[in-house]
């Protein structure tokens, strides 16, 4: 009963923070879907060779077939799609087909909870010449995979790389993630710096409310001044 009462007394922001930390992987597919749409529209004018267009069409066909699989057959469909996508990625290193194929392979590996393989594919996607469109989200997902592998230091490194990319559109989320991991490591000063940076630069952001709650908690616990 005491445990239940303690849980009920937790601030709403702390509960939301815990929920997002626990289920952050559920949001990745949405982010990637939006990014891929942006890629298609952003680079369509630059896809001038028939080989690139053919590769994109092949990839779209593979992904479409995979998306039509029902729950009973989706595992088999992933097993069929993955080598095809990996082959496209290997044959098209450095161009838009390779970029999208690496991201698609990463999504499949991620759905299979193969965190190391997924991370490798996310990182491969950052090496193409078109990576500016997607580097931030790829580094973010590499960080999440690293968290799943309990490799916190690598996760911190990839979150920092995501923040440093020129086209990062979700820095507030990344700052909170960094603060969360640093706090978990016991580096409360560094965690507070990220929370404060979030508070100062994104005062109206939803992540700022969570950061403020952590700053209050850290001060109340005497972990920061």
Question: Which stretches of residues belong to each language-model region?
Answer:
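N-terminal positive-inside, membrane-proximal cytosolic segments immediately preceding the first
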Residues: 1-35
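Short solvent-exposed coil/turn linkers within tandem alpha-helical repeat scaffolds
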Residues: 89-98, 112, 128-135, 162-171, ...
């Amino acid at each position: 009963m005491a445990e239940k009462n303690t849980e009920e007394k937790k601030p709403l922001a702390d509960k939301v923070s815990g929920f997002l930390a626990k289920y952050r992987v559920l949001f990745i597919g949405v982010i990637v879907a939006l990014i891929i749409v942006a890629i298609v529209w952003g680079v369509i004018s630059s896809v001038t060779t028939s080989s690139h267009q053919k590769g994109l069409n092949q990839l779209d066909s593979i992904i479409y077939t995979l998306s039509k699989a029902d729950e009973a057959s989706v595992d088999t469909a992933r097993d069929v799609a993955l080598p095809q996508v990996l082959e496209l990625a290997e044959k098209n290193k450095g161009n838009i087909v390779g970029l999208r194929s690496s991201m698609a392979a990463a999504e499949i590996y991620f759905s299979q909870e193969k965190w190391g393989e997924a991370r490798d594919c996310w990182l491969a996607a950052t090496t193409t010449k078109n990576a500016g469109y997607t580097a931030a989200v790829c580094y973010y997902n590499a960080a999440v995979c690293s968290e799943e592998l309990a490799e916190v230091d690598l996760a911190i490194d990839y979150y920092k790389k995501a923040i440093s990319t020129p086209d990062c559109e979700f820095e507030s989320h990344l700052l909170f993630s960094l603060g969360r991991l640093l706090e978990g490591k016991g580096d409360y000063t560094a965690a507070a710096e990220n929370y404060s940076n979030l508070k100062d630069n994104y005062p109206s952001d939803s992540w700022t409310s969570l950061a403020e709650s952590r700053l209050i908690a850290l001060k109340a616990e005497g972990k920061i001044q």
